[in-house]
Amino acid sequence: MNIRRKLGQNFLNSKSIAKFIVDSAKISKNDIVYEIGIGKGILTPFLCEESKKVISVEKDHQLYEETLAKFSKIKNLKIIYGDGFKQYEKFDIFVSNLPYSESKKAIQWMLMNKFTYGIVMVQYDFAKKLLAEKQERKAVSVLAQSGFEMKILKKIGKKNFTPNPKIDSAIMSFLRKDTFSKELIQSVNLMFSFRRKKLQNIGKKLGIEIESNQRLEAMNNNEIIKFAKKIRKI
């Protein structure tokens, strides 16, 4: 099975939306742009026009070969075959239309990498989850809100993809506020497996003495991050 289909990838087919994504990234001629999932390459030429260099990573070998041949004359483009989350490239701006199945993984990866700004296409419902308030928050909501200033820039309908997905998408911006370690991310995820419990009871589950009857879901993001650091002694 094609990797992209297995991952739940639908290819953007609108050049006007591709241009909107690139324009929203606020790229300068001094910027190095990192793109995970080159796909059919609809974003890539626009990214190359605006930036110093574009590094695009594709894990589907057929798509990698196709885009390598298609964009062979673009001087400031480096195309890598492999997993974009496992490369060690330095960059300023992250731009991607990711498979929806990798959205949570992508957010956690973004939190650990020191770039300035990102524009990412995600499932619309996932975008709302990232921006959720207290009672509706998940671990990924707290982490994303603590690490980035986020906005939904545009809702994108199904007809703008091939094949048409069953759900709508959203273009989101991510302005860096903080960078988190893998250990801190794991700590927040662990805490949210007990999200309905009081801190005192969470402490017992984790073998830590905590004198507080406050519930995790009642805490603000800063309090949760501070508590997560205490658990892991980060």
What does each of the following model-derived ranges do?
Residues 166, 194-196, 201-234:
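Conserved Class I S-adenosyl-L-methionine
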Residues 1-190, 222, 226-234:
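Catalytic cores of RNA-modifying enzymes
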